[in-house]
Amino acid sequence: MESDFIGLFSLLGLLASLNFPRLTMEKNMTPTDETTVAFIAEIGETSRYLAARNDLYASVMIAQAILESDSGQSQLSQKPLYNFFGIKGEYNGQSVTLPTWEDDGKGNPYHIDAAFRSYGSVENSLQDYVEFLEGSYYVGVHRSKTRSYKDATAALTGVYATDTTYGDKLNSIIEQYQLTIYDTY
């Protein structure tokens, strides 16, 4: 039943994306912005649905997907991997090893090779992200434990990602693309 709802929201997102090229041209957006707007249209409604059902901010979920996947353009986010959130490990026994950059917690980047989850579908990626945040380690990102999305992004900094400016980057994306509209139900 839930997969039917996710499929419906994916379809709604696809239909909504048909209007975005017209809107982006009117706003004189760059090609990068147009790519991001199309990516938001692809995952926005499903993210809204999943976030609402799981005490999360859809705006943060979408901003993380934009940042972690380069608006769905990174190698890791492409078919058949669909890892929009940079989640390491395995998903149903599936993973891929790729080079990545980490932050030592003091703003100094370093390179590692890491195994990342491979999902096989957009829906699996979004659903697994929600499940990934269910543990007590991420309790500070839940709506019921925060006053705003900014509290949630602050709770992710240094925890979800080693980047010491992670929350600031997410806040900037949320504001630039007005993602808080996805936090309403």
Regions found by a protein language model. Give the residues of each.
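Catalytic cores of secreted/periplasmic lytic hydrolases that degrade extracellular macromolecules
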Residues: 2-185
